[in-house]
Amino acid sequence: VELSEHLKPLQSYIGKTFKGEFANSTPENPTYDIQYWERALNGSAIKITHSVNNGEYGGESMIMWDAKVESLVSWYFTTAGFYTQATMIIENDKLVSYEKVTGNENGITKVRATINLLSNGELHTKSEYLQNGKWVDGHEIYYKEAPNAKVLFK
């Protein structure tokens, strides 16, 4: 089952579930994210659904090619009530997104995020937020494939 030409570099992640622990997670307060990647809209899109700590927070992303802007674009909707719109590029096994945030209560207006597509099939994500006019470190997570993990919402 094929993806559109512009999404093909992400083909190996389709149909897989990944689980990752946040870099700032502790044994007393573990924080982990589960995400599931799937083919959508007859292969013209990828849908990524994720949840943190079984639904404390979560969201859904759609990634597609936009011929008008000649770029991958995405939309991300969250359980916290905000959403992002992004342009994305794939370079050197990295998916890099530049996101505009709407409706965030913490003063975050932009996000720069990178997903490293590691040669062993794992993922590494890192983000930065433009919060109250300053760039600050966001989250960092290393994911491993976890076929039995489930994305859960409350």
Tell where the protein language model's regions lie, with residue ranges.
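Hydrophobic small-molecule pocket/channel-lining residues, especially in calycin-type beta-barrels
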Residues: 1-154
